[in-house]
Amino acid sequence: MKIENIKTLGELKKSGYESKSIKDELRSNLREKIKSGKPTFEGVHGFENTVIPELERAILSRHNINLLGLRGQAKTRLARKMIELLDEYIPFVSGSEINDDPLQPISRFAKDIIEIKGDETPISWLHRSDRFFEKLATPDVTVADLIGDVDPIKAANLKLSYADDRVIHFGMIPRANRCIFVINELPDLQARIQVALFNILQEGDIQIRGFKLRMPLDMQFVFTANPEDYTNRGSIVTPLKDRIGSQILTHYPETIKIARTITEQEAKLDMAQSDMVYVPSLARDLLEQISFEARESEYIDNKSGVSARLSITALENLLSTAERRALKSGEDKTTLRLSDFMGIIPAITGKVELVYEGEQEGAAAVAQHLLGDAIHTFFPAYFPKIEKLEKQDEKTPYTDIIDWFFAESGFELLDDCSDEEYERILGSIVPLEVLIKKYQPQLQKEDKFFMKEFILWGLVEYKKLSKDRFSEGYQFKDIYGSFISKL
């Protein structure tokens, strides 16, 4: 007999069901997962040796948890993943507002119904997906919202005195009894509201409007908070921090590989889009490097963080840029270009908080700086390093390319030009082909033209060529030609 088919308290007792607190439930199921070698927080990448072990220790210790980290560090995702460590179903007294355990009732409603009906008390089953409550801490949250208040309408309808505890309307926290309760952005919660959480965290009981209710709530609290006060927000009051068992610091992905895994998992790409646009591996790496550069940039306030959402939305915009270009050219398939990266600027500008120098430059200019920095960082990994100081007349691997620009006066690369035109223009620069054959002989055919454009952008970043943006595309010239044209 399936346990969730049990419908009365008597049947539940006969089945041998034993009550467990939610913290014991999480602990027990986590122990089984660790023993079996299964991943405990599947789909969360980059925390395997840092955050997840600390989170597992906190759960095994039955602690309430505070996840402390900058924006876009999977804090809420981790909290939501804890649902998977709960039992699939738990019983509760049918009609109970606070999910009363039939074997250990705490509300007056549940105690009264069990006293009247005994083993015939009807019970229902709560699935683990319904045992997750989340509240974003905003300045307008009140004690009544979280804990509860006296309900005058209820008192009038039931003809009850205000001295009767049945007039209480329970808030979110009592209604989340035997559940995981997450409060996001805890510092935004007013200090007086944080004080109201003291008793719940330490003793597990609540007080509503002077009613001395001894309700030992059974809850797993998870808080999320940002460590930096970069807005006009408050802070976590010290006695509340003292009552939170474990504080765990999250972080951004530490490698390009992990960042790529996260972006590819989270980006919402259309199947037709993915089939139409071929994305070279280097393009995906460059996209992730932009976030890494942003976190170190002098133009961006690193205290506010650069969310992993930047790369996710940038990838979506990047493919949409290439898709739009291909549709305008009447092409069924296309390969991503480096010039398509201009389409990701709107995804960057809204997700970085600029310092004074960045504001002076402008958000769009900062976004272009970040792309340039990413190319500058990656270039030496693919081609010989360009030295700042070179001897006069010394031949370098790039001399023939630079000479070609002196001879041909450069070219224009339009944003919406067809693949045929794009390949014709880059194919006309023969020294690019020679350089790739020498230093990237294993390069796939599909990646060749992206790599050619990458070389040109790299030479621009190392001040060997110049690149100017105009309304319809880019103009590449030798460094002196660009200087003369500006006179």
Residue ranges and their predicted role:
Residues 2-257, 268-285, 298-303, 383-487:
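Conserved ASCE/P-loop NTPase catalytic core
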Residues 58-61, 84-88, 203, 293, ...:
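Amphipathic alpha-helical interaction surfaces
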Residues 263, 287-291:
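Short alpha-helical scaffolding segments that buttress acidic/His motifs in well-ordered protein cores
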Residues 273-280, 293-370:
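C-terminal helical "lid" subdomain and adjoining coupling/linker elements of P-loop NTPases
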Residues 335-423:
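Extended alpha-helical coiled-coil/bundle linker/stalk regions that scaffold oligomerization
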